[in-house]
């Protein structure tokens, strides 16, 4: 295959990155959602940018406080300290080679509900059509992405986590 003919539109902007699904060329959409599935913040980076980098950007997390749940890719002592100073507690699973640390039961339960973010990603791609491989300009790419995010925000039913604190030591999930 002749790769020189590929990726001309974004040749100076898009990069190649690796995800759990393999290699891809383009960009990454980073989103922060709340328990009701509403998008609080989003950021677009090149494909080769570390997933932790947007979390270091103050403007990306300005609407966020409290607990932030992420996957193992967000594990970083430095990032944990940086966010903690800003009033954000980063909660992730531990990697296999790490020491087990104590975690509140409610945090453990909520960490298992991370599939909600995957559902949001799926709805953005399949219902709101943000994943598109044939854009002919950066402007069209960004217009389509922002329109898709706006359309998602107007969806009547979003993936969510229904829970309430019964008292200081109990958590109810529905």
How does the language model describe each region?
Residues 51, 113, 142, 146:
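Hydrophobic (often cysteine-bearing) scaffold residues that line and stabilize catalytic clefts
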Residues 67-69, 82-87, 146-174:
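Anion-binding and metal-coordination hotspots
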Residues 1-96, 149:
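Polybasic low-complexity intrinsically disordered regions
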Residues 21-22, 134-145:
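Structural motif
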Residues 1-2, 101-102, 144-145:
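Short, solvent-exposed polar/charged micro-motifs at secondary-structure junctions
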Residues 67, 72-139:
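Helix-centered, glycine/charged polyanion-binding patches within enzymatic domains
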